[in-house]
């Protein structure tokens, strides 16, 4: 496969990156998700990429940039549901109904999309009774516990298998963006922080940490692009295998790189003021979305 970006893809990447830098600096990201966030991204065309004729490979490029900025919100659901559900959608993957559900961004959404075993169902949020968690894992992702999630109605035009695959790939692209951002943040700090009258980045132990982190991010990026290409053209390869591999590698890269960035920052890495903790908490959370690392590893092994 040939993964060099075309001129159009580079323009897409640069455009989304400029939007993220302009509209979603760290201070804005820390405020969390609101309707304005969704509207701002909608204006850029992020959610309508597939509907507008772009490929899944193009969409992963956009989501990598969103991940680099750790933009909050039910972004993947915005792409999957575009043109099918009005307002702000959120969702969850629940192949075995009946158990209590954890729903992200319930208060800000208009509808919850539920991926059941054989269909996508839509449930209006005004029909849902949920209890917001006081201390969610990711402070930028509010979560509500729903004891009895209504069945909802089947969403016409939604292929549940394709949604699961696409959702996993877009989430993996977001994770790759976070993995690269962690490398960049840790490298910048290692070049700036001095000990023994020299940058700490000059020490071999730090160099090895950062080199390993970069390798993880690049390997994951390649896997994600390969999975996106198979979504666009299933004849290229085994779609399920590519998706499982991409989500597994991207999740590992995001989590391990966030931990590495925390370590390189030393004591500062554990403070609220340093942005690294935002990536670490989001990385933990995203490893529970569209399949856990264990579920993807088991699928690959089988």
Predicted regions and their residues:
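FAD-binding core of flavoproteins
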Residues: 70-184, 188
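Alpha-helical interface subdomain recognition
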Residues: 1-69, 163, 168-302
């Amino acid at each position: 496969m040939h993964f060099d970006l075309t001129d159009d893809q580079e323009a897409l990447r640069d455009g989304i990156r400029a939007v993220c830098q302009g509209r979603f600096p760290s201070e804005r990201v820390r405020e969390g998700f609101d309707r304005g966030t969704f509207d701002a991204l909608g204006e850029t065309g992020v959610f309508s990429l597939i509907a507008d004729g772009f490929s899944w490979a193009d969409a992963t490029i956009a989501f990598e940039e969103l991940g680099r900025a750790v933009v909050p919100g039910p972004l993947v659901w915005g792409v999957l549901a575009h043109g099918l559900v009005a307002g702000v959608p959120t969702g969850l993957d629940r192949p075995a109904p009946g158990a209590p559900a954890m729903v992200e961004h319930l208060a800000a959404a208009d509808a919850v999309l539920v991926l059941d075993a054989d269909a996508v169902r839509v449930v209006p949020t005004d029909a849902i009774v949920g209890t917001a968690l006081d201390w969610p894992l990711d402070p930028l992702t509010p979560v509500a516990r729903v004891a009895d999630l209504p069945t909802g109605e089947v969403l016409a035009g939604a292929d549940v298998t394709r949604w699961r695959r696409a959702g996993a790939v877009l989430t993996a692209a977001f994770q790759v963006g976070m993995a690269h951002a962690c490398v960049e943040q840790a490298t910048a700090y290692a070049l700036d922080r001095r000990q023994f009258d020299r940058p700490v980045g000059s020490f071999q132990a730090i160099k090895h940490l950062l080199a390993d982190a970069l390798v993880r991010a690049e390997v994951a990026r390649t896997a994600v692009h390969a999975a996106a290409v198979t979504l666009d053209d299933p004849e290229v390869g085994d779609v399920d295998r590519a998706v499982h591999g991409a989500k597994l590698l991207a999740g590992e890269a995001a989590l391990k790189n966030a931990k590495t960035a925390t370590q390189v920052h030393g004591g500062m890495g554990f403070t609220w003021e340093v942005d690294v903790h935002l990536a670490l908490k989001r990385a933990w959370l995203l490893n529970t979305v569209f399949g856990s690392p264990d579920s993807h590893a088991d699928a690959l092994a089988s």
